[in-house]
Every structure is written in C-alpha cells, then in structure tokens.
Amino acid sequence: PTFGRKKEDFVFVSGIGCSSRFPYYMNPYGFHSIHGRAPAVATGVKIANPDLSVWVITGDGDGLSIGGNHFMHALRRNMDINILLFNNRIYGLTKGQYSPTSEVGKVTKATPYGSLDIPLNPPSLALGAQATFVARTIDRWQAHLSQMLERSYHHDGGSLIEIYQNCNIFNDGAFEEYTSADKFNNVIELKHGEPMVFAKGTKGIKLDGFTPMVVDMEKHSLDDLLVHDETNLDLAHIVANWTSHPILPEPIGVIYSVDKPTYNSEMVAQVEAAVKQKGAGKVQDLLDSGDTWTVK
C-alpha cells in the first residue's frame, strides 16, 4: 500500500533469521538488530521519535523463541509499533530445525524422530498479552496482505500481523492448502459485521454453544451463522483457537481491533506533567549534587 509519506518517516527493525534480512531486501531506514530483541529496539526508536512509523520484522523462531518475552511485552504495553511475524514453521537460516510453530511430529535435523512440542499459536499469544490489533494473512494473497498492512498502519497502538510464508528450501508446502487451487475450501476471510461464510458461499460457521462448527448453506441461512465482530475479545479468542483445526477453515483477516491508550503517548504525558510540576531539571545538576541521594 501507499501511505503518502516519505521514506524517511519509516523505520524497519528486524532481529535474526531469514525474515529479518528484510531491511537489506527493501532498502528502508532501519536496524538489523539483536536476536529476538527487535521489539525492544523498536520501542526505543518510537519513544525517541514518536513521529516515525515503526515496523518490526521477525519470524516464528526469532520472535517466538528467544524473543518471546519481548514480543509479548511490547504488545502488552501497547507500544505504537507494527509487528510483522513471518511464520514458515521452521528455522531456515540455521538450516532447518523445528521452530515454536512447527507441527507435532515434524521431522527435522533437530528432531529426527519427530517434534514432541505442541506448536505455539501467535494470535492466541498476542490476545493473551492484551494486544489491541491482531491479524493474519498469507504471502501469496497479495491483495489481502496489502489490506492488512494498511489496517496495521492506521491502527494507533501495538499490532501483530502473522504472515503465513512458505520456505521452499527447508519446509516447502507448509501452507499449500491455503494457496492451492482449492484454497477457498480451506480458508475463511474474516470481515467485520458480516456472517462467516467460505467455500464460495457454500459453507458457513455456526456456534454450538462456544464451539464453532461448519454448516452447509443449502440447509442454513445467513441468519444462522456467526457474525464476525473484530471488537469482541471473547470471539477473537474463539476464532484464534481454531488455527490449524482438522475440520474448520483457517481464519485470515483482522481477528481483533480495539483502541486503547498507547504506552508512548502515556509516557509523553507523564513526562510533561512531571516537568510542569518540578521543572525540566538537568542531569549535570543531579551528578553534582553529592554522592548520596534521599529517595522520598
């Protein structure tokens, strides 16, 4: 998408991994930073210059393993940064080890008899961390990807876009069912305020209590279906939890979006209030005031 702003207004901060080489491929202003710590670096950038549009580029290994704590707390604080998590369910840069999102039973160089780990669900983790914007898209769905980037850009607060991406070297076909000719039978595109239909209108999603189920539209009407509400946190948890479900379609689109005060705006207000009450102060005056300080 085109945002009508100068290149100098954007900063891209990445960690370590195949996805984190993004700054080299796209030639933006930014940092190829420390393994797992891109959200921390991006936080500093946003606080130092609030006018910048700050984007974090990470992967399922970098962002959810060594960087899981930074990922979680950046979203919890509602820092006004945009996190793009490229999920290919594998460690690619280190030549094909299983990652936090790899399936149970995944055979890799690190798990020759199959992974025993239960895969982590990025949207569910983000919602649990109280993120204010959570979305998912697919690398091959270019128009949809562009829409999600635009929504994230205009969201005032911390945002996560999980991007399903194929790794044709170490995990080829990871998301083939969502990009093949029959993808519309396997994916549901979430649209705020609209009934949940998929498979070109032939199937829908209905709630049985708290459990979503697939129904045949020849036997049901739109009034029977679950209506997506991206402002409903309870519904967002339900939608996120049917990720990689054996029967339900994979949800893509905006899962959750609400407005809350951002950490960076609250911090600026707090500093301004303190300066107004006590004056700006000088670091040198503090250093020259003696060897001890009284904390009141």
Question: Which role does the model predict for each range below?
Answer:
Residues 51, 99-154:
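Conserved thiamine diphosphate
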Residues 132-189:
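ATP/pyrophosphate-binding catalytic subdomain of soluble kinases
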Residues 68-75, 93-106, 125:
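Active-site-proximal loop->helix
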Residues 6-10, 48-54, 76-82, 86, ...:
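Short coil/turn connectors at secondary-structure junctions
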Residues 169-296:
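Flexible, low-complexity linker and terminal segments
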Residues 16-92, 144-146:
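Thiamine diphosphate
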Residues 1-20, 26, 34-36, 49, ...:
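Metallocofactor- and cofactor-centric catalytic cores in central/energy metabolism, strongly enriched
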Residues 16-18, 88-90, 141, 164-169, ...:
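Glycine-rich beta-alpha junction loops
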